């Protein structure tokens, strides 16, 4: 009987109606306390509809799954429209964030997404099909996600 009641409960999340969600980074942090180490997790997620809207979120929790869920909710709330022309960006654009630098170039049909992992996640989520990218100055995927989204928005 108790099981039947659980099955009838409403889910607290709405179905994400075809959104593309990419987990860019999951980070484990340790706080040293009297009894040992206490771990917490942080997740960065990029979310988009594949038709020009994309956003990112950063969530923290004591377990991995709640941190990813928090990041997803934040990413859905922060979605912004990106201009896409024939599956590519309209023109070349450069961006900087801290030491990281990225160059985004439009590419011809059939090229695909030529990018590193963090930049690729953003491009796939927003629906870009043909783009060339080059990243300089950092290896941190969180920095590149921070950098790529405002750079694409500025087009």
Regions found by a protein language model. Give the residues of each.
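Ribosome-associated RNA-binding proteins
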Residues: 2-147
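Single conserved hydrophobic/aromatic residue that forms the stacking wall/gate
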Residues: 146-155
């Amino acid at each position: 009987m108790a099981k039947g009641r659980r099955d009838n409960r409403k889910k607290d999340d709405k179905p994400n109606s075809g959104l593309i969600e990419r987990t860019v980074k999951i980070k484990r942090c340790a706080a040293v306390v009297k009894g040992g180490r206490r771990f917490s997790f942080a997740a960065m997620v990029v979310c988009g509809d594949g038709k020009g809207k994309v956003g990112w979120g950063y969530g923290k929790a004591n377990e991995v799954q709640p941190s990813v869920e928090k990041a997803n909710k934040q990413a859905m709330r922060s979605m912004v429209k990106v201009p896409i022309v024939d599956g590519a960006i309209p023109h070349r654009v450069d961006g900087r964030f801290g030491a990281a630098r990225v160059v985004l170039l439009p590419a011809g049909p059939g090229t695909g997404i030529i990018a590193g992992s963090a930049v690729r996640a953003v491009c796939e989520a927003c629906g870009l099909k043909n783009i060339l990218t080059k990243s300089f100055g950092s290896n941190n995927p969180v920095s590149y996600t921070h950098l790529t989204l405002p750079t694409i928005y500025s087009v």
